[in-house]
Amino acid sequence: MADILTQLQTCLDQLATQFYATLCYLTTYHDNIPATPPPTSTTPSAAPLLAKIPKNASTPPVPASAPQAAQSQSQASPPPPDTANPQTGGQHADQQQQSPDGEGLPAPDSPATFAARQRELARDLVIKEQQIEYLISVLPGIDSSEAEQERRIRELEGELRIVEGVREERRRELGVLRRRLEGVLGVVERGIYSRD
């Protein structure tokens, strides 16, 4: 198990991902009813409509430093398919909407489905935020002053010295027991070979 700070960083990363996914869902599947109706003026705008601008049918420009083979290959390749053609077929048009910039978007969810998914996404965000709050609350030193933390560090250093002393004593006892065992094994070995 990772330490608390690593868990906290992971939860923050997951929360950011959940925020992004929630925003993507909300912008993609809402009913897309404009808050204000579009202007109905008949005066043409200063910018020409994109549909009236002719498209270049030629291949993209190639730098002068490119080899001749690359130029001939790019000229031999067929032009990309024209995606500006309007969609035909009512069934396919019902499944996707055309946005002003021409991108196809999925059909919006029904209001009940959209509301249910909104609640689910909000609940997931709240749960992740509660996990983050819990991890922050269990971080050491949150509710103590600097002096209390220094006192606690000194206490822990004292406990560590005591434990290290006990460890050193056990290591010496182990050395004594090892020497005694070697002596017993030496006597047994001499006794076994002396009978032969």
From Swiss-Prot:
Keywords: Activator, Coiled coil, Nucleus, Transcription, Transcription regulation. One of its GO terms (biological process) is regulation of transcription by RNA polymerase II. Residues 144-174 form a coiled coil. Pfam families: Med21. GO terms for molecular function: transcription coregulator activity. GO terms for cellular component: mediator complex. It is found in: Nucleus. Component of the Mediator complex. Belongs to the Mediator complex subunit 21 family. Component of the Mediator complex, a coactivator involved in the regulated transcription of nearly all RNA polymerase II-dependent genes. Mediator functions as a bridge to convey information from gene-specific regulatory proteins to the basal RNA polymerase II transcription machinery. Mediator is recruited to promoters by direct interactions with regulatory proteins and serves as a scaffold for the assembly of a functional preinitiation complex with RNA polymerase II and the general transcription factors. This is Mediator of RNA polymerase II transcription subunit 21. It comes from Aspergillus niger (strain ATCC MYA-4892 / CBS 513.88 / FGSC A1513).
